[in-house]
């Protein structure tokens, strides 16, 4: 199990990203617009820099929903390989069966 604080911090980051997404996208559009004057684009970049760092999408870490493990994460199932194996063997993940040949 991952530390509870790490899992909670990541959840907080997800909510911050969701709240800041529209504002960040608008500022980035202004910054990337070559038709606008450089002063306006510079002001937008300063505003973007003043927003919280945890509002950036790259700060989110994919973690297992079951254990909180950050590595060996399957995006489609939102769980780690270990949790997938345990729940798959118990038959709790639909469509997952132990292979045999």
Swiss-Prot record:
Q: Please tell me the species this chain comes from.
A: Rhizobium leguminosarum bv. trifolii (strain WSM2304)
Which HAMAP family does this chain map to?
Ribosomal_uS14_1
Which Pfam families does the UniProt record give?
A: Ribosomal_S14
> GO CC terms for this protein?
cytoplasm; small ribosomal subunit
According to its UniProt entry, the protein's GO biological process terms are: translation
**Ribosomal protein as UniProt keyword:** yes
Q: Which gene name does the record give?
A: rpsN
- Give the molecular function GO annotations: rRNA binding; structural constituent of ribosome
* Protein family per UniProt: Belongs to the universal ribosomal protein uS14 family.
Record's SUPFAM superfamilies? Glucocorticoid receptor-like (DNA-binding domain) (SSF57716)
Described purpose of this protein according to its UniProt entry:
Binds 16S rRNA, required for the assembly of 30S particles and may also be responsible for determining the conformation of the 16S rRNA at the A site.
Xref: InterPro entries:
Ribosomal_uS14, Ribosomal_uS14_bac/plastid, Ribosomal_uS14_CS
The name this protein goes by in its record: Small ribosomal subunit protein uS14
| Keyword terms, alphabetized | Ribonucleoprotein, Ribosomal protein, RNA-binding, rRNA-binding
The protein's assembly and partners? Part of the 30S ribosomal subunit. Contacts proteins S3 and S10.
Query: PROSITE patterns given for it?
Result: RIBOSOMAL_S14
PANTHER family (UniProt xref): 30S RIBOSOMAL PROTEIN S14 (PTHR19836), SMALL RIBOSOMAL SUBUNIT PROTEIN US14M (PTHR19836:SF19)
């Amino acid at each position: 199990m991952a530390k509870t604080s790490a899992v909670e911090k990541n959840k907080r980051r997800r909510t911050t990203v969701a709240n800041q997404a529209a504002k960040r996208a608008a500022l980035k559009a202004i910054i990337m617009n070559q038709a606008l004057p450089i002063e306006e684009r510079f002001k937008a970049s300063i505003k973007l820099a003043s927003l919280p760092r945890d509002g950036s999408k790259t700060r989110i870490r994919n973690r297992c929903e079951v254990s909180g493990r950050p590595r060996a994460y399957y995006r489609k199932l939102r769980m780690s390989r270990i949790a997938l194996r345990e729940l798959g063997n118990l038959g709790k993940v639909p469509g997952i069966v132990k292979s045999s040949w």
